Amino acid sequence: MLLKFEASSELRLVDPSVSLTVLRKIRLSHLPDMTMTSESSGKKCGEGDGKVAGKSQRKVGLVYDETMCKHDTPNGKVDVECPDRIRVIWEKLQLAGVTQRCVVLGGSKAEDKHLKLVHTKKHVNLVKSISTKKKDSRRNKIASQLDSIYLNGGSSEAAYLAAGSVVKVAEKVAEGELDCGFAIVRPPGHHAESDEAMGFCLFNNVAVAASFLLNERPDLDVKKILIVDWDIHHGNGTQKMFWKDSRVLIFSVHRHDHGSFYPFGDDGDFNMVGEGPGEGFNINVPWEQGGCGDADYLAVWNHILIPVTKEFKPDIILLSAGFDAAIGDPLGGCCVTPYGYSVMLKKLMEFAHGKIVLALEGGYNLESLGKSSLACVQVLLEDKQIHGSSETYPLESTRRVIQAVRERLCTYWPSLDASMASNENLKNPSAERNSADALLREVEELKSLMAARDGELEARRKELKAKNKELEANEKELEAGLMLIRAREDVICGLHAKIESLQQERDEAVAKAERIDKELQEDRARSQEFKEDTEFCLSTLRREKELAIMAKNKDLEAKEKELEARLMLVHAREDKIHAKIERLQQERDEAVAKAERIDKELQEDRSRSRVGNGSFAFSQEFYEDMDLDELEPLSPEFNEDMDSEELEPFQVIKKNMERSHKKFIKDMECIKFIASERARVL
């Protein structure tokens, strides 16, 4: 079967037994270029005003924010999902002059309450906390527990911007402020599930936008949303979030390889059609192998997606625009061209009044990514009718998959059942067009194209003749100029000699300059070496000085501690001395009191001695001045003259005086000792 993609964007089935013979006689160079060209190229564009050279254009919104490039691998290792993905797209659009004709919007951060419409609170908090976990090791630990995820300090902000930007564009399109839009965002989102990040995806951007329109903006009257996912990988996260929701029709065409292609398992199988109210509203078209191209995708569009979309009648279309099915993608292994993407998008724009929002998902070949994105934006702008041609067949596995999907879903979508007979077209290439008239019309179209090209060639011939006349006139001018040149040859010869001498002088000057430069470099090297030595010496001196100061400080601290210890000893000794002084004062006071008591007793004894017998009277002054050692014993004669009874009182008095005197002497010595000790201490 031969699939021909014509300017009308229709998929036409051509009988290879007839048309190949004709088409091979006509070189494809006679057909228009497959890439879309802008009618306004070379004309001045008004930036973001939606008008080109006075012609009204669709209002196309573009979101790009360089902040999303901060999301990168923490160790600088190159990954396929890299910041250059969105940079390449933006540069491609700028070079083509497309950004000036669109409404350029900055990024917008998503609100937590909108994210929690499809994600759990725990997951939202985890992504938010990534930026606060300052150590990469902690982020790496979190990433290691997830599937195909890397994180750095900018990941959280980029994820919030990606989700919020898709919400922003979708809201403006639903409001009618924009006709359509393309959110050039990263990280992608269709793998992210309600409670888990995976497959490069942190938040499910498209799912957040769809839930926002349905639940947060009922005033926009968006009741049915079609989510188309043409990324080469199955959008497992989006499928699970709307598994039971009949308001959202999810259509995903992807590589499945019987469950062995990422994200693996049976989630992407065509039997996964939804559950409960959402049964029949989840459509998976799983490729059995790689190598699928434009013909395969457009066959799916014509035989499954377009009929179902006509029945569903969406109010808005959200497109998970992954370009990893493009030619040369390192992960996809398929070969969709920019032309193929543009035709698929053009067909979708026939629904929902053209209200369609593209959100970037995958795509890891930078060249294919840029070209495919540009082709899609040009379709959004409705630059020009799509031109192109491709002589390719859908794979046999594509026919099997389309038939299996239609049989599985025909109970939910009558249009698939009603057109089952047309499925035979996939088996019989000439079923749609088996008449000679159709072939003749095609040949006539090709002839008209060739006639137009012949007209262009004739115009070129006329231009060449005019240029030949100009060349003849120029030749005459050149001959006149040649004569002038010959006249100046002599002057030039002299100048050559002078130039040679100047060149020689210049060479000598250059050699001298090189020599001087070499000497300067040597001087700089020596100066640098001297500088390094000086700095080393200074640093050594500073270090030694610091060490000496530290040693001196230690000595001072030791001395200070020693002085503090001595001071403590002095204070202790002073306390002891004060205590001893107090004790001595107490003893002195006691001795004085004792002396006073003794003196009182002596006075009493003296008074008794004066009145005892009345025979002798001794004055107090005599007693105080008397030295008992000078008392001589009574003379024998005196003893003989007195009776023993008369003598007895005198003897008693003498003994008492001797005893009191000795006691007084002892007390005085004690008082003197106390006084001397006190004087010594003071």
UniProtKB/Swiss-Prot annotation:
Keyword 4Fe-4S attributed: no
UniProt keywords, alphabetically: Chromatin regulator, Coiled coil, Cytoplasm, Hydrolase, Metal-binding, Nucleus, Repressor, Transcription, Transcription regulation, Zinc
Enzyme Commission number: 3.5.1.98
GO terms assigned for molecular function: histone deacetylase activity; histone deacetylase activity, hydrolytic mechanism; zinc ion binding
Any one biological process term the GO annotation gives: root epidermal cell differentiation
Location within or outside the cell: Nucleus; Cytoplasm
Keyword Nucleus: yes
Region (Histone deacetylase): 59-382
Gene3D superfamilies: Histone deacetylase domain
Catalytic residues (positions): 191
Tissue: Expressed in roots, stems, young rosette leaves, flowers and siliques.
Cofactor entry: Zn(2+)
Uppermost EC category: hydrolase
Co-factor binding details: Binds 1 zinc ion per subunit.
GO CC terms, sorted: cytoplasm; nucleus
Reaction it catalyzes: N(6)-acetyl-L-lysyl-[histone] + H2O = L-lysyl-[histone] + acetate
Site for Polarizes the scissile carbonyl of the substrate, residues: 364
Residues that bind Zn(2+): 231, 233, 324
Main localization category: nucleus
Coiled-coil annotated residue ranges, if any: 430-608
Domain of life: Eukaryota
Homology family: Belongs to the histone deacetylase family. HD type 2 subfamily.
Note: HDA5, a tandem duplication of HDA18, is not required for the cellular patterning in the root epidermis.
Main function: Responsible for the deacetylation of lysine residues on the N-terminal part of the core histones (H2A, H2B, H3 and H4). Histone deacetylation gives a tag for epigenetic repression and plays an important role in transcriptional regulation, cell cycle progression and developmental events. Histone deacetylases act via the formation of large multiprotein complexes. Required for appropriate cellular patterning in the root epidermis. Involved in the differentiation of hair and non-hair cells in the root epidermis. Is not directly involved in the regulation of the expression of pattern genes.
The protein's name in its UniProt record: Histone deacetylase 18
Organism the protein comes from: Arabidopsis thaliana
